[in-house]
Design a protein with these regions (language model features):
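N-terminal Sec-pathway targeting helices
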Residues: 1-14
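Lipid deacylating catalytic domains
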Residues: 6-9, 19-135, 142-275
Length: 275
């Protein structure tokens, strides 16, 4: 290949690369119409025995939909030391932090609460956030709940504005620590029986931030009021820890007009008509 041909080939490759980059930027362009443009970060907490890879599908979907262009990872070592991989640029819109615990199988309340605190403190010290959202799956919910139990009233930490609980098992897991014959009061949502875990979390009724957090509780139903691993009744028990705190402090009328909202979504398995 002569020098002239090589130059033309190089020029062609450069043009292709530029075209690819432009296309990539177009596909990840922020959607200013359908999504709120905010600099508040959202933290994703994975479940038992899992990792940040489990959060990748959701974060990739968020990027493709134009929700954000910024996703970083917070890796938490066994001793609680946090390493941030990636950078959140100043003014980044809806940045996401995938949280990963190296010790991803411990249910110890003090440990998982400390891990969550260390992540929040690291992000606060690095980026000076004053607010945040949290999304947690399965065991990740326990980490968030115990964090709130210990630090929910700490005004020196970033405030949680929105909390999404996916497949939470706050009342216990069937065959492990879920009370037999568990039922929820139709009016208050109070469980008929409480295991040690739930009794500990009752403290949330005293420290859970008032008029601050919007909660979305998501649980699946493949039939039989279960998602296959967690019974719906265990997930529904979350309501008593959050919503009823307002009833203990205010009248019911004030509760109905409260700024704090609690939504519950049940995903059901749809039977296919295909053979």
């Amino acid at each position: 290949m002569n020098k002239k041909s090589f130059c033309w080939l190089l020029l062609g490759l450069v043009i292709l690369c530029i075209a690819f980059l432009v296309k990539s930027q177009q596909t990840t362009q922020l959607d200013h119409t359908n999504y709120l443009q905010n600099t508040r970060p959202t933290l994703f907490f994975h479940g038992y025995g899992s990792s940040a890879n489990a959060e990748k599908h959701m974060t990739d979907t968020a990027k493709k939909a134009g929700v954000t262009e910024t996703v970083i990872t917070a890796n938490v070592a066994n001793d609680g030391q946090v390493k941030l991989t990636g950078t959140i640029p100043k003014g980044a819109v809806n940045p996401i932090i995938k949280v990963e615990y190296q010790n991803n199988r411990t249910p110890d309340p003090k440990v998982i609460s400390h891990y969550a605190y260390q992540v929040v403190k690291k992000l606060q010290d690095t980026y000076h956030f004053k607010e945040m959202n949290v999304v947690a799956h399965s065991m990740g919910n326990m980490s968030v709940l115990y964090y709130l139990l210990e630090h929910g009233s700490d005004e020196n930490l970033p405030k949680i504005v929105k909390q999404v609980a996916i497949a939470n098992h706050v009342a216990g897991l069937e065959g492990m620590n879920l009370p037999q014959g568990l039922a929820l009061d139709s009016q208050t949502g109070k469980p008929s029986s409480m295991n040690e875990q739930y009794q500990q979390l009752l403290g949330l009724r005293e420290v859970y931030p008032e008029n601050q957090i919007d909660v979305l509780n998501i649980y699946g139903d493949i039939g039989g009021e279960t998602d296959g691993s967690v019974l719906n009744i265990s997930s529904k028990a979350l309501r008593y820890l959050f919503l009823q705190i307002l009833m203990s402090r205010k009248s019911l009328m004030k509760l109905m007009s409260s700024q704090t909202m609690f939504w519950a979504i049940r995903w059901t398995k749809v039977k296919s008509n295909k053979p």
